[in-house]
Structures are given as structure tokens and as C-alpha cells.
Amino acid sequence: MASSKKPKIAVVGATGNVGREVLDIIDEKEIQYSDLIALASSRSKGSTIDYGENKSVVVADLAEYDFSDTDIAIFSPGAKVSSEFAPKAAKQGCIVIDNTSHFRTDPDVPLVVAEVNPEALKDFRKKNIISNPNCSTMGMLVAVKPLHDHFKVKRIVVSTYQSVSGAGKEAADELFNQTKSIYANEAVVKEKFTKQIAFNVLPHIDVFLEDGQTKEEWKMYNETKKILDQNIELTATCVRVPVFISHSLAVNIEFEKPYDEDQIREIFKKSPGLKMIDYRADEGYVTPIESAGLDPVYVSRIRRDPTIPNGLNFWCVSDNLRKGAALNTVQIAEILIKDYLSS
């Protein structure tokens, strides 16, 4: 590992949506580094990525790269690539922060949301890998964690409204192209999604499991338990909607302890990573388009659920490419630099 006080940072999958966002956020946050390396497949070798205000970096080939003098590598290349290259980088002494689903269920890999469980980072040396949670889980838990600290969450029922960018650039292109085709009275082409996504909603994200859940719903259940509390029960319905950026969630919580709404609002106001906009009037809530490009998880529509004891409903929205992926990995890197690499 490099000995410089300023870390050497690599961004793997730098040409993708999340990788580019990582580069932008590193620049926005003015993170001090000795070198910043952009890595991708051999197809992109030698190409230039523009990021930040007026910076650029030349892409190197991931397969040819030696991680032994790199301090931190942020991986966003897809699970298959991470499964091959992240362990290699970790064995060479580089700390890997992985954005894919591959390591999330590994008991020896911390699954971390910066505002929720940063203390879990203490165990990263077991494999030198840290995992970033699913984007919907992350947005929800930033809002749920401070409530759990005060009232102890017993059960969560959540319905998600997830943008197409969560399925990658090809999915966003498909929504755009299908929308154009419909207006032009042309045939709709389906490639990325099994059904038309334009002007439609699909209750199907990732593969179906034997019990009828989709894997996305299973992820939310398992990741919530690993990150927050094994005793919390959760059921999810995950839906893809024809929105380009930002995921929205309708969250219903049953607490073990009683609460009043003023307490909830005060907690939300004081919690890191959250912004409450809830006026109980027209335009008094946040929508996906308003959260796009911004860091916070926004909470709105806060109200009691009168059908169960200690029940609460709220709406939360966050940019899935920023807080749901890129921002959290950079926040983790900041914690590592400050608390684990500074000595």
C-alpha cells in the first residue's frame, strides 16, 4: 500500500454512469489524493473522461493494472468484473469499495451506509473489501436509522418506484427510444426490459425467486438486517417506473415504542444526510426529478398509520446514481482516509 499521506485512488468502471459520478463527486468534495486513476475495459483504454469543472483523466486498462501501490479502489463495473478483479486488488493491499451486489451477503465484508453504520468499517481488513448496499436499501435506511435509534423498528413494509438508470445506460436509452417511438407511431422495441417501460410500470426488478419475490426485494430484506438490525422484519414490492433518475419509496414502519409526529419531524431535521420537505399542501413534497443531481435523501408525506399501533408512513426520494451509489462510496473513502489511513 502507498505510504503517502495523500492516498492514491483508482475508480474502476470509470466510463459508466456511476463511475463518472464518482469522479465528479471526488472533485466536488475536493478530496486530496496523490493520484487519481480511471480504469475500464481494454475497449476504453486511452480514451479521455472529462469530470468536475474542467478536469480530465485518461482511461487505463483494468486487466493490466497493478493495485499494489494504490490505497483505495472504488469499483462500479458490474458484479462479474468485481468478482474477478476486486479480490485481486484486495490481495495486493488496496482497499476495495465495491458498488456491485457481489460481496453484499459475505459475512466477512462490511456492508456500509456512511450515515448509518460507519462503525462496521472496523472489520474491513478481513478481506480488504467494503460493500455498498443496494440503492433502494440505502435511501430507505438513511431515513429509518435515526427513527430506529429512538423508537426501535419492528417491521417495515416498503414499495419502491425505481428509475430506469438503476438498470444502466441501456435501460435509460430504451425508455428514451420507446417514448420517441410511441410519439412517432412506430413499433416499440423491447431489449433491456421484458415489457414496455415507456408509459408503464413493471413490478419486476432483477430475477424472480422460487417464493415469488424478486431478487431486488430479497436484497432489501437481507441488507436491512445486515446493516441495521437482524430483528427487523421487512417486506418489499419493487417496481420499475418510467423515470430516468432517482428512486422513490413509500415506507410504512411499525415501531415497538410509541411516538408523536413532532418527535419524528425533529429527528428528521437533525439527522445527517436527510432533508425534510413536508408541508401538507400542493407542492409540499419532493419528487424524483427534484432530487436528481443532489446529495440528500428527501423525506415527505410524514403521517401516522392509524391501522396499527405505533405505525408511521412517509415518502422518501434520492438520486440513485449519487447517494444510491457514487456518493456513498466516496463518503466511505473519506472515512477511511480520515480514520484508517491517516496514521
Label each residue range with its predicted role.
Residues 275-301:
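A glycine-rich dinucleotide-binding beta-alpha-beta segment and adjacent secondary-structure elements
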Residues 245-250:
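Conserved glycine-rich beta-strand-loop-beta hairpin in the small C-terminal domain of fold type I
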Residues 239-242, 318-323:
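Glycine-rich phosphate/pyrophosphate-binding beta-alpha loops
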Residues 252-254:
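Short hydrophobic/aromatic beta-strand micro-patches
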Residues 2-197, 233, 257, 266, ...:
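N-terminal Rossmann-like NAD(P) cofactor-binding subdomain of oxidoreductases
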